[in-house]
Amino acid sequence: MSTAADLPSTGPGLRLRQPGVEPLVDQDKLPSQPGHSRESSDANADANVSSDKASKTYGRTPDGTVFIVPTTHDMVSQLLDPRQPKNFSDAIVLTILGLHILAAYFLPSSYKRIVFAFVFLFWRACYNIGIGVLLQIQSNHRRLVTWARRWKLFENPATGKNPRPWLYNLLKNELETKIEEDYEFEKAPIEYNTWLVFRRVVDLILMCDFVSYCLFAIVCGHSPEGENPLIGFSRWAIGISLIGFNLWVKLDAHRVVKDFAWYWGDFFYLIDQDLTFDGVFEMAPHPMYSIGYAGYYGISMMAASYEVLFISILAHLAQFAFLVIVENPHIEKTYNPPPPRKRTASESQGDVVPADVKSLEGAFDQQTLAPTHKESPAPVHNLVGLNNIDLFRVPDFTVIVLPSYVAVLTFVTPETPVWQAIFVLHALAWRVWYHLGLGLILDKQSKTKMWTRHFLKFGESAGEAWRQWKGLHHISMIMCNTAFIAACWKMYSPPEDWAYGLVMLKHVLGAGLVALQLWTAFSVYDSLGEFGWFCGDFFFDQQAKLTYKSIYRFLNNPDRFFGTAGVWGAALITWSRSIFLMALVTQILTVFYISYIERPHMQKIYGRSLRREAGLTKFIKRSLPPPVKGWQESVDKVLDDTTQFVEDFLDTARPKFAAGVKTIVRDTSALFNMAPARLTITRIAPDLQGHDPKLYSLSVQGTPSMGTSIDDKFTGKESLTGRFPKQIKTMIYEYGAPLRVKWRAPAGHSKKDWIGLYMVTDNRSRETTEVPSLGRWAPTNAGVYDSLTADVSIAVEEHPVSTTEATEIDMVEGEVEFRGDKLWWTQGVFEFRYHHDGHHTALSISEPFEIRISKFDEEDVDVGAKGLYEQAVESALLPVVQNCLDRDPDIAPNQPEEPFGGHVERDTKYAKRIVYAIREMFGIEFAPPVVAADGSVRKLAWRVSNAKEVLAPYSMSRSRGTTTPAIQDFPAEKA
């Protein structure tokens, strides 16, 4: 079921249609709403009909077909409600469910647990893997609809084109029985009919998944020996409550999203309706997959079985994987595509203060250090995350060395009470410093800009103050967590008997709380970025802005409780008084920091724009009965008065307490070009006989590279006869430029023939291709393969060879174009191979050609004349960047000053292409985030020029620059 709750919206909780999609039905075509005039009863009836028509939901297929979306019912009602019509598929589902129940009753007791564990895991795999694969190929290639069209499932037998009329009649009866209004099987779009068939498969899988889980819980359920009756009653009461809560979540979610999102309808078509996400969608992100699985844990408590608990956790994790891998990418692609590229850059762009922290940092540095260059790009080098570790930076080096020292001491010191006390006190000291020490610094920064003033006093910039603060905060956070983990390690004693008492449960709950804190941290960082993570609005408050997306949609301060969940989880796992004390101190310090440091600053910066209540709070208050609401308002008033008194007291006492306190990678992804060449035994296709490879041919056209490789091949180091170039020259094409392949074959060639692009060194055999194409292929004929991306490569459809080129055998030809992801984004020598009938038998191989990035020629450009040099770099870089961005007008700029499209930030492949090209052209290596941060060819050219200027004194290349050593610098040479 689709859970698209975390989508951008123009209002609270509104789900947007894809930008650029016009309203499906014009307003003048829809019946108007009835007015308030007194008309006859017939007029009122017409108005009611008009209103009913206007309330219909309209859908649109990818080809633009508009249709009325009929009303459907949920699967439980369809299967179990006797008032709902039943059909053959219902009988199949109910029969399979009955077989599950019979198996649970008749199987021997010794086999029940293992059998139903495998049965449930099978249906869970059908759900998360089976449905996941179907939805993935439908989202990327619309393959389910393609299969339905190819198999002619919905083709009327009256046309004579349906090879299986019985299946058509069966589907027609099945679907029309279920949908009584606004639906005609023959007139419905193929996308909608395919979705209805897909729904029946989903019904079977979901019902079997749920029933098999319940049966597994039943066969595993028991009452622990010697259980206290009060504990048993509490266990069942909590379990039933969780099941009831789970049931309410599912029902309320279905009320909001209806069957369209419940059954992933937006993978097939879109509807002309803004879905208001209220109710349960204000409680938690993706409620059907998060809190919607609370019932699993309720059933586990009632069964009193760790087997049920562990299989519930496994199923829940599989559901989250399904969400991340299948649903989220589709939701992002469908409802939140990158914004269109600005066609012209703003003339006043250089005068606008950047809004993000990196731009602010660069802007402050420019004001204090280089005010003459307003267009200087901002630096890009994040701190948080393993992929951002750079040992050339002091903070990163420190957060590797210091935790290593702590780890060594943890392992080599004995487990004595003295050492345990030392480690606990060490962790407590870092905790107090992290919350209280850094908090006091931020408080002074908020009130007097103390931190920034300190660096300005010594001639540094505000940007440098910000960078130093980030380093201090990062080191303190890492050491705080490292010291706490070390203390937990010292205080933890592995249990001798895992089955004793609540030992296992404590470990499971503790691990769950740790996972909750990690998820909270990732969500907070994803929402705030490094600017918010390091409290950037304490340093650059004039450009700070609020965000209420992701986890902040539901909670105002997720760190207040969820941010310390892992500490309490560690206390449960260790079951140590010292760690419990640490958790309590952490909770108090966190609340203190939020209440007396963060909140006053937020109120000062944002004022009335601060949201008073989060989504979860609003939902809970709306759900309270009136008497409870009145009591809650009274309690709120008492709490407000108490809080005001405490704040006044602290304001009075603070000066006394404060007296005497002193304030204090190049990307390493490997390029897996191919699978290793391996010995292949090839079966020649039976229909290959009679196909003469000489009749097949390929010719390649592309954008010739401006550079030449002749100077590299003939350098004077060869013998005299080897210095003369051959008459036949290998074609050299631009890096990333589209390649057009013209193919020619006999008229009787297989429609499943295809053309692949390979490196010349990939294959040892000229008759058989030994390595996969890795997506770099195109069919010769359309409509043969299921892949949506295959047919788009066909530039010219198959057609007979012109009469002027007629031969003894009838020949046909066509053209395919390789661009974007179908190219090799590296330099080398390549070839195209024409393959027979969907196999890897090569009937023709093109002439080898080279893909080459021309080196930037600095001979005619004076590096010292920076303006001219930047213009030359811009001119050389623009066509290369356009190629790297697939020459897509929505992504690639037309002029150096124009910004890149939003896809560059979404997909790192574009940035990786560009930095590779820059490295080969200029010998300068940038990290991929630099491209997205700069956002234009002009800023990239400035960055290249600046890097060249910095590295010029160390360059070994020929140069006419001012840094070339003069002879007077070497007195010994004069003698």
Swiss-Prot record:
One of its GO terms (biological process) is methylation. Residues 1-58 are annotated as: Disordered. It is found in: Endoplasmic reticulum membrane. PROSITE patterns: SAM_CHO2 (PS51598). It comes from the Eukaryota. One of its GO terms (molecular function) is phosphatidylethanolamine N-methyltransferase activity. Keywords: Endoplasmic reticulum, Lipid biosynthesis, Lipid metabolism, Membrane, Methyltransferase, Phospholipid biosynthesis, Phospholipid metabolism, S-adenosyl-L-methionine, Transferase, Transmembrane, Transmembrane helix. It catalyses: a 1,2-diacyl-sn-glycero-3-phosphoethanolamine + S-adenosyl-L-methionine = a 1,2-diacyl-sn-glycero-3-phospho-N-methylethanolamine + S-adenosyl-L-homocysteine + H(+). It is an enzyme of class 2 (transferase). Residues 109-113, 222-228, 300-305, 415-421, 490-501, 599-975 are cytoplasmic. It is a multi-pass membrane protein. The chain crosses the membrane at residues 88-108, 114-134, 201-221, 229-249, 279-299, 306-326, 394-414, 422-442, 469-489, 502-522, 578-598. Its main location: endoplasmic reticulum. One of its GO terms (cellular component) is perinuclear endoplasmic reticulum. Pathway: Phospholipid metabolism; phosphatidylcholine biosynthesis. Residues 42-52 have a biased composition (Low complexity). Its EC number is 2.1.1.17. It holds the Pfam family PEMT. Residues 1-87, 135-200, 250-278, 327-393, 443-468, 523-577 are lumenal. Catalyzes the first step of the methylation pathway of phosphatidylcholine biosynthesis, the SAM-dependent methylation of phosphatidylethanolamine (PE) to phosphatidylmonomethylethanolamine (PMME). Belongs to the class VI-like SAM-binding methyltransferase superfamily. CHO2 family. This is Phosphatidylethanolamine N-methyltransferase. It comes from Fusarium vanettenii (strain ATCC MYA-4622 / CBS 123669 / FGSC 9596 / NRRL 45880 / 77-13-4) (Fusarium solani subsp. pisi).
